[in-house]
C-alpha cells in the first residue's frame, strides 16, 4: 500500500510478506513528484523493518530501498533492493527487483478517462 501524509510531506509504502516480514518505508515527497523513494532499516523508530525469528537467524534484513517512477510515456517503473546478511555464508546479498508496468486499459466510469 502507498500512503500520503500531506501534513508532514511524507510518502509511505507498506509491504508485508507472508513468510514473516513487515516493512514500513518512506521519505519526504511533494504532491507532484514523479520519483518517489522509500527507505527502511531495522530498529528505526519510524520507517522500519520487522521479521520473524526464523528468518532473522538465517537471512537478516539490513536495509530496504525502493524507488517508484512515473514516466512521461504513462508507464510506471519500480526498483527495490533488500540487503540481507546470510547466516550460512556470513556474506551480504542484495535481493533486487525492477520492472516497468504498462497500462492496458483505464477502468474509470467517466468518459474522459476511458
Region locations from a protein language model:
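Soluble ligand-binding/transfer domains with enclosed cavities or grooves
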Residues: 1-113
Amino acid at each position: 500500500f502507498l500512503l500520503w501524509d500531506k501534513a508532514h510531506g511524507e510518502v509511505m509504502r507498506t509491504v508485508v510478506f507472508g513468510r514473516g516480514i513487515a516493512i514500513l518505508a518512506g521519505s519526504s515527497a511533494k504532491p507532484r513528484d514523479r520519483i518517489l523513494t522509500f527507505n527502511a532499516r531495522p530498529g528505526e523508530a519510524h520507517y522500519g523493518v520487522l521479521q520473524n525469528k526464523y528468518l532473522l537467524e538465517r537471512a537478516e534484513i539490513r536495509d530496504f530501498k525502493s524507488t517508484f517512477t512515473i514516466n512521461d510515456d504513462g508507464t510506471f517503473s519500480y526498483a527495490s533492493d533488500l540487503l540481507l546478511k546470510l547466516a550460512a555464508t556470513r556474506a551480504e546479498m542484495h535481493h533486487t527487483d525492477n520492472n516497468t508496468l504498462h497500462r492496458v486499459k483505464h477502468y474509470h466510469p467517466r468518459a474522459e478517462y476511458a
